[in-house]
Amino acid sequence: MEKFTTLEGVAAPLKIVNVDTDMIIPKQYLKTIKRTGLGTGLFSEMRYKEDGSDNPDFVLNQPAYRNAKIIVAGDNFGCGSSREHAPWALLDFGIRCVISTSFADIFYNNCFKNGILPIVVSKDDLDKLFDDADRGANATLTIDLAAQEIRGPDGGTVKFEIDPFRKRCLLEGLDDIGLTLEKGTQIDTYEGEKKTEQPWL
């Protein structure tokens, strides 16, 4: 998993509440178990018209936000059915951070497991970040995970909380496999002891 230390980039304002996982990645894209290639399906029902062409009204199709790395979103982001394809699609598109006042629990947990930082902020702070995001490429945000703060284009900062264990995993790029490999020596020792104690196994 790619480390997350400091992220600087354009933030796309998605001023919609209750964005569910079917909106993030519709069900027709769930046939694959690959983590790559899902970026084209991200928000597809809003990004594309019926004929498959881009919907110019959708924020990620607007020139200022096509390379966005951050999404500033309305309340309760990631609600709905459980599907890890949702963070996969965000990551494949290039999104490494989502900021909102609240997230659905399963989506929130899945983000950390896939190298995406979900940040919870107050309503007042979200409104300020929406104002910054509305300025497009003229105003980038900086996410400093070590300092636990969001720095705006005009020097303002928003502090955020994060579980220390999850923070460490993101900073060091540790997913579940990486965490298991960290215990490699202990696992080898345990296996060796078991072979000695119970050679018939």
Swiss-Prot record:
Its EC number is 4.2.1.33. GO terms for cellular component: 3-isopropylmalate dehydratase complex. Pathway: Amino-acid biosynthesis; L-leucine biosynthesis; L-leucine from 3-methyl-2-oxobutanoate: step 2/4. It is an enzyme of class 4 (lyase). One of its GO terms (biological process) is L-leucine biosynthetic process. Keywords: Amino-acid biosynthesis, Branched-chain amino acid biosynthesis, Leucine biosynthesis, Lyase. The keyword Cytoplasm does not apply. InterPro entries: 3-IsopropMal_deHydase_ssu, Aconitase/3IPM_dehydase_swvl, AconitaseA/IPMdHydase_ssu_swvl, IPMI_Swivel, LeuD. It comes from the Bacteria. Signal peptide: none annotated. SUPFAM superfamilies: LeuD/IlvD-like. One of its GO terms (molecular function) is 3-isopropylmalate dehydratase activity. It catalyses: (2R,3S)-3-isopropylmalate = (2S)-2-isopropylmalate. PANTHER family: 3-ISOPROPYLMALATE DEHYDRATASE SMALL SUBUNIT (PTHR43345:SF5), 3-ISOPROPYLMALATE DEHYDRATASE SMALL SUBUNIT 2-RELATED-RELATED (PTHR43345). Catalyzes the isomerization between 2-isopropylmalate and 3-isopropylmalate, via the formation of 2-isopropylmaleate. Belongs to the LeuD family. LeuD type 1 subfamily. Heterodimer of LeuC and LeuD. This is 3-isopropylmalate dehydratase small subunit. The lineage of its organism: Bacteria, Pseudomonadati, Pseudomonadota, Alphaproteobacteria, Hyphomicrobiales. The gene is leuD.
